[in-house]
Amino acid sequence: MKNIYHSDIYKFQEPVKSYWEDTTKENFNLSKLTKDISSEVVVIGGGYTGLLCAINLIENYNLDVILLEAGKVGWGASSRNGGFCSFPPIKISYKKLQKIYGKDETKKFFKNSVEGSNYTKDIISNYNIDCDVTGDCNFILAHHPNKFQQIKEQAEVYKNEFGIEANIYSKEEFDKIGHTGTEQFGALSYKPGF
């Protein structure tokens, strides 16, 4: 095995296009680094994290910043996501988080997740980013009748322990506002998110 990732990830000269790249036009030009240059800070990587790091260093610290990207800006994971802004960004439950890290650290984690979601919305607004923000919350569906009680409990924890705005919808209520399929048995909505 030569590489641990699919060979497409190493094709910087001919990156595989994502849905987002195929449905929008590029509105900036990139130049190759062909000579020695200097700056106070060099940020390596032009994904979301690298771009926001560069912006913050320039705007908040007035630093001279150069951003280097081996491929195209936004190429990789940043342009290959579902486009949702939701939290928490993990698959394990809040109960398991509390068991592993304790209640205080879990509260901090959720607080940071809420702040991150709000920060993302602020970035979109402050820079007039045309990204078709839709909605103001996220939903967790009960995919089986016995899961409805779990999401009801989760809503109470979100509200009472983490201070997160959360609402519960019965199957019939959720039918009226969003999803009439037979595979849902109620839902939890929480804010912020989009």
State what each model feature region is.
Residues 34, 74-78, 177-180:
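Short glycine-biased active-site loop of nucleotidyltransferases that positions the nucleotide triphosphate
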Residues 45-49, 70:
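Glycine-rich Rossmann-fold phosphate-binding loop(s) that bind the pyrophosphate
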Residues 2-16, 22-23, 91-98, 122, ...:
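Flavin (FAD/FMN) cofactor-binding and adjacent substrate-gating region
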Residues 52-56:
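Short amphipathic alpha-helical face segments that pack within enzyme cores
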Residues 80-112:
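Glycine-rich active-site loop/strand segments that organize a redox cofactor
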Residues 1-41, 59-63:
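Extreme N-terminal leader/targeting segments of oxidoreductases
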Residues 58-80:
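Glycine-rich FAD pyrophosphate-binding loop
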Residues 108-122, 153:
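A non-catalytic, amphipathic alpha-helix used as a structural packing/dimerization or gating element
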